[in-house]
Every structure is written in structure tokens, then in C-alpha cells.
Amino acid sequence: MGICYSANNMALSTKRVPLHIWVLALTALWIADAGTLTAQQATTAPTSRAATKAENADFTAAADEVLQQMSEITGLKLRTPLKKTLRSRDEIRAYVIQQMDEEKKPAERYAAARSAEAFGLIPKGFDLDSFMIDLLTEQIAGLYDPKAREFYIADWIPVADQRMVMAHELTHALQDQHFQIEAWVKAARPNDDAELARESVLEGSAMAAMIDYLLLGTGRSVQDLPDIDPTILVGDLGSTPALKRAPPFLKDALIFPYFGGLTFSATILKPAGWSGLSAVFAKPPLSTQQILHPALYGSGKVPAQVTLPSMEKLLGADWTKLEDNLMGEFGWKEVLKQFLGEDRAKTLAAAWDGDRYVVYEQKQTKRMVLVARLRLASEDQAARFFGQYSEALEKKHGTRTNLFRRPNFFSFDTPDGGVFLRCVGADCVSFEGASRAVFDGLGKALGWPAAPDVPKEPAADPAKVATQPKTADSLSAAPRF
């Protein structure tokens, strides 16, 4: 769910991702590890500094030179002149705030943050707006603004690193003149997963072009480099104040368009070169699944269209819908990872074939209801998902009573409402925060057989209420609602 202010609309707001300092550092170090650059060429995250007058005078000339080189690398010709500007940290911060306000209204950003809370992706009450402003102000190295058709670079970036920033962002400028990148990304709306896939094409292709720029004169290209495992790189993203306090999901979401997109772009480049990658703009990927598994893009796999019935009548007039969208394979991998770990999450999410989720909020109490329907690749995969996601739900909700389990139905009660998981065929529905009667109404609207009845039992003995021990990690990774 691109990030300026995010990776996924579900969690944040979509805007073309500005180039971050840590991306420069990780990319150069990764290339150095591959034996392509010398240690002197591998940059580290630069510290804040003011540009000298001489550097300002050289900036435009350097940008023009790099722009010509990127045109030659990508095969995209410059059609109209491009504005180029150095920006101070205060100017970058003002730009971030302006873009955030233009992209989504406060109520929309509130809804997106609450939805991320509902999935357990960010802690309850996490100030997402402030965090993203601080992070982007701290980390932006440069950006291309499609609306203004202007390239900005941070004036504190050392001269040695400016050309690396230029290579990435000026690739976007060239792409915009040929493919109108902002309109191209937004054409995927309202499908957040498809929009993130398009963001990943933009960032991944610009990463590939930046690497080819770094490799000029070596006789090598991005096609010659080893595959990237983004999960390894994410572990290096804790060196700055804002990143240190970032929830794991946000770190993953920040890096995915760059390095997930780079893996996809490199796969496309190998047989066809840059003309083949440009053709992706005419036939964009349909989901993050196609970014994660480029062979599925090549085969033309189309995600299943998954729907959910209206919940308004079942919930009542005092509930407001906050979000109604898709998570995609990337989103579900992140949800599962919070509670099951990276390896299990990756395997389970790979069986994704389509999904839909809705989030509702009660006006007075601010309680939430989360309903998610997931289509798996087969009934066997649905059964596997049922077994492991029921475990995830137990980890997510520390205090629970009346736990009830059958082969395809699982439920328990929490202080904030019932939690239900039901699988029928290859479809699974997860329902958190409402009563059994509302869940039964949903099942009826789906045309599913009635779920098993929970046996009547005496009032629970408080001493036997299952309570998961609370730790600092569990409180931040799996907030209760």
C-alpha cells in the first residue's frame, strides 16, 4: 500500500515514491558485495550539509549530463525541457506536507491508518501522519514531481551522491514524458494492490536504470547482478531516528516498490532489454503477486474478482465504513508476517488468488469491525490457510474466551467482539469485532451453509480465561481492538 506517503493505499496514501537516502546506501553496498564496485564507490548514508555556491552552480550542468546518459540507457528521449531545483530540508518538509494534504483529506488518512491498525500492521494510536512527515524529511534524497514536471534534489546530499540521485529521479522524468506516470499509476484505482504493483514498476525500473548508470564503463549491467532478497536489506534500515521507531510493516512497505520492483524489472530486462521494460507501461501488472512472481506476469495470470456483501444493514446505522479494498499478496504476506514469521507468511501468501476487505468503525465507541474474504489457489491451500491463520488470530487477540474450533470454522470472544474464521471451498472469511448474529448474516448473504453452533456452556471461570502474556514486542506488533 508508492510512498509519499506510502506503499499501499490501505495503510497510507499513494504518491510517487521519492528516493530515500537509505536506498542509495543499500544499493551501493549491495552492488559492492556483488563485486562490481570498489569500496570507495560504495556510498553510505550522507549527513546533512549545506551546498556551496560552486556546487549550486554545477548542479544544473551535472543534471543535464546525467539526463542525457539516462536517455541513452533507457532509450527514452527527452521531449521537453525539465526544471531542476536544489531544495533545503525545510523546503522538503513543506513539500511533503503539501503533497500529503493534496493527495488525501485528513478523514481519508484517518481511515487508512485505522484500517492498518485493524489488521495489526501498526500499533493502536500510532501517529502515522507525523511519522511519515519526519521520515520523509529525514530521508528524502531527491524526487521528481509529475505535476510540476520538476526535479528536486536535497541540498545537503554530498556532490558524490548527487549523480546517483539524479540517475534515479531523471529516469522518472523521462518516463513521465513518455507514459504520464501519475495518470498511469492512478489508472489502477480503486484497486490498491494493482496501484502498488504499478508503483513498483516505476521504482523498480528507475532502480535498474540507476544501477546501469553506476555500472557505466564496467561492461556490466543490472542484468548481470545477483537476485535481491529484500528481507535481508530491511534489516539494515534502523540507523536513523525515524526508521528506528518504524513498525516492521512500514519498513517493508517502504522498501518493496524499490527492491521488489527491481527484481521484477531485472526479470523483464534480461530477455528484452529496455524496450521490453517500456512495454510494461502498455501492459501493466495486475497485482503485487505479479511483482513478487514475475513469471505470473509473463503468463498473464488474472487475479480472481472477490466481493463482499454490504454490511450496513447487518451492523446498524451507528457504523461507518472506513475502507473497502484489496490487500493483494504483498499485503497478506505482511499481515501474516506480524504473527507467523517471514517464512510461513511468504509460503501462505503465495497461494493468494484474490481478496477483498472492509473496515467499519462505530461512531461513538470507535470500535472497529474488520471483514476480509480471501480466495486461495485451491481447497487444500484454503485448509492450510485456515489452520495457520487461526493461530495468527489467537496471537493477535491476547484475551479470549469461548474458543470453538471445527475443521472449517473457528471462533472466540474478545472484549471488543467476536472473532470468526470460516472456509468454504477455496474461500476463507475472517470477521473480527462483531457478534455471532452478524457473522451468520454475512454467511447467509454469501450463500454459504450455516456455520456450526457453539455449544452452550456455563459462564467462564475467570481463572480459565486464556490470556496471552504481554510483551513490548507483542503490544507493538499485535495491538488489540
Each model region followed by its residue ranges:
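Active-site recognition of the HExxH zinc-binding catalytic motif
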Residues: 70, 164-181, 206-207, 378
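Post-HExxH zinc-binding segment in Zn-dependent metallohydrolases
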Residues: 66, 176-233
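Pan-zinc metallopeptidase signature
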Residues: 238-368
